[in-house]
Amino acid sequence: MGLPGLFCLAVLAASSFSKAREEEITPVVSIAYKVLEVFPKGRWVLITCCAPQPPPPITYSLCGTKNIKVAKKVVKTHEPASFNLNVTLKSSPDLLTYFCWASSTSGAHVDSARLQMHWELWSKPVSELRANFTLQDRGAGPRVEMICQASSGSPPITNSLIGKDGQVHLQQRPCHRQPANFSFLPSQTSDWFWCQAANNANVQHSALTVVPPGGDQKMEDWQGPLESPILALPLYRSTRRLSEEEFGGFRIGNGEVRGRKAAAM
């Protein structure tokens, strides 16, 4: 499945490039990755390298562990060089380290920072979970909309809307670095919910919040403005690693899940 995700940039200042142009600032080469597809033990990844300062053509090499050259490309413009790579889970994290090597026509070259892909794609815990509940009314009656997103964590990340009794109401597994968006009808009396984000490294959940606010007030008694955030939730953390059974049990998609309890915190 195609996953559009956002780029994660790692930039390292170079020690030398073309000595003939000393008036330029110290050149840099950046390396970035984008997860295109997720497999059980692999990731189809787009890696880009860019050195914007030296004049083209620029020769880019994608190198792996022990400086082994994986791919090479000559770019005649200032556009980044792109490399498609099937990154598979290795026994040693050191085997999944990549960096860009850029050289100009003068023969000078510069390296990028190292990308630790094992950490990025398999072992990075979910962190900095943010959840926002908003009451919206676009003419068809009020609906509660929730945005749930962790700022980092290895894919795939499963996001869940959970009631205070542990009942999982909705689940999504969004694209890498994209938020989960939940929408549901509010009940006539307030209820309590939280957002949970989980990957194969850990589980993190936000604090319980009442939706809509006002305790046990009736919906018609609540006079808060529509289309304004109800609450941005703080987070609690759990560093317990999920078992394959727990992680594999999550459902993918936007449908309602009945009779399922959330993973123990």
From Swiss-Prot:
Keyword terms: Adaptive immunity, Cytokine, Glycoprotein, Immunity, Secreted, Signal
| Free-text tissue specificity from the UniProt record | Expressed in fetal liver and bone marrow. Expressed in peripheral blood lymphocyte B cells.
UniProt xrefs under InterPro entries: IL-40-like_Ig
**Signal peptide positions (record):** 1-20
**Location of this chain's protein in the cell:** Secreted
Keyword check for Signal: yes
Q: Some GO term, biological process aspect, for this entry: which one?
A: mature B cell differentiation involved in immune response
Q: Which Pfam families match?
A: Ig_C17orf99
Q: Which domain of life is it from?
A: Eukaryota
Cystine pairs annotated here are none
- Per the record, the major location class is secreted
**Gene Ontology MF: a single term:** transmembrane signaling receptor activity
Q: Which positions does UniProt annotate with glycan attachment? A: N86, N132
Q: Name one GO cellular component term.
A: external side of plasma membrane
What is the protein's known function?
Answer: Probable B cell-associated cytokine that plays a role in the regulation of humoral immune responses. Involved in lymphocyte B cell development and immunoglobulin/IgA production.
Question: Could you identify this protein by its name?
Answer: Protein IL-40
State the species of origin: Homo sapiens (Human)
Could you tell me the gene encoding this protein? C17orf99
